[in-house]
């Protein structure tokens, strides 16, 4: 069973083909909203494209990814960062709380039940006032992932906002990056 939703099998292709800057600008702006040294958990950290701007912003990063191949590349790039090879819905999140959690290009790869588990775990892992940044299409939809040929699904903006409000978040959304990825910004009350 590929806990990485097909990304372990296709890890090398993903690392070669992923646009190196997509997601960095918004993640950089988000990351600079923290005090240097703040703790941030990155779910689905992959080989560290988004992570780079968070490390550059002086944040203390923790990385979780279910693909051993992608995580190996991440560890070579950031040898000082604590990591866990686990699915986001199964990770312990290092048994600690964080100032921020980021999940770019991850949530919609998961089955709906796992998405709900991850959002709940994120709420529990964030300190009061902690911030959560993630991507998913605005529309409720399913599609086939170009790389893995597996089904992806977005629950849609109304469902995500409802779930997040129920978990004690204030939500604002509506930013889109160069790759047409839609970003949700949430702050835990």
Report the location of each language-model feature:
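Short catalytic micro-motifs in class I SAM-dependent methyltransferases
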Residues: 105-109
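A conserved beta-strand element that flanks and buttresses the S-adenosyl-L-methionine
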Residues: 102
């Amino acid at each position: 069973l590929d806990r990485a939703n097909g990304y372990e099998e296709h890890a090398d292709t993903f690392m070669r083909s992923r646009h190196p800057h997509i997601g960095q600008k918004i993640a950089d702006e988000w990351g600079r909203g923290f005090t240097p040294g703040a703790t941030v958990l990155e779910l689905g950290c992959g080989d560290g494209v988004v992570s780079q701007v968070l490390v550059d912003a002086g944040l203390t990063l923790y990385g979780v990814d279910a693909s051993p191949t992608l995580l190996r590349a991440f560890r070579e790039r950031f040898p000082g960062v604590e990591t866990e090879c686990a699915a986001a819905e199964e990770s312990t999140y290092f048994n600690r709380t964080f100032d921020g959690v980021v999940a770019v290009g991850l949530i919609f790869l998961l089955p709906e039940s796992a998405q709900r588990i991850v959002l709940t775990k994120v709420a529990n892992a964030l300190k009061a006032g902690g911030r959560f940044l993630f991507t998913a299409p605005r529309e409720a939809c399913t599609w086939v992932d170009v790389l893995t040929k597996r089904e992806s699904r977005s629950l849609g903006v109304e469902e995500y906002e409802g779930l997040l409000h129920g978990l004690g978040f204030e939500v604002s959304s509506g930013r889109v990056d160069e790759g047409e990825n839609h970003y949700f910004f949430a702050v835990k009350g």
